[in-house]
């Protein structure tokens, strides 16, 4: 097997062309390609190009909406909700993070709730964006347990219910 080296721009272009060819609109493809490129740049190979086949599979199956429009609703001064319309979470977060940051700065604390989206990407880009705005952030998801295995992971001998 041979190794192919790609520049960060080539990674972005490859990801974007692939996503566009498989049902994403330009905005969605750009957001996801940026995420893929940055994960590769940061050395997180499990969240870079490695994720592209899963994105394509979800798009082809119709599970992931590559052209969906998110709906943002301000529930209260500190609670923002974004209806994801089956888009991938990074696309939904792109819509909600600016309003979340604004609410947190105005009120001292804020929560962003996302419904009907799919998450299979890195979670630190969102917290990094908020940290760059001088905020503290926590990111959580309800994705499958043990989504990323660790080298010395041991499983419990008893099931905890």
Predicted stretch roles:
Residues 37, 90-115:
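Alpha/propeptide regions of enzymes that mature by internal proteolysis
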Residues 20-23, 42-46:
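N-terminal and secondary-structure boundary signal
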Residues 76-79, 106-109, 132-136:
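Short coil/turn connectors at secondary-structure junctions
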Residues 51-96:
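Active-site cofactor/substrate anionic-group-binding motifs, chiefly glycine-
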Residues 111-153:
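Glycine-rich anion/phosphate-binding loop at the beta-strand->alpha-helix junction
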Residues 152-161:
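Single conserved hydrophobic/aromatic residue that forms the stacking wall/gate
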Residues 1-22:
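Generic N-terminal amphipathic, Lys/Arg-enriched alpha-helix
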Residues 26-37:
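Short, well-structured alpha-helical segments
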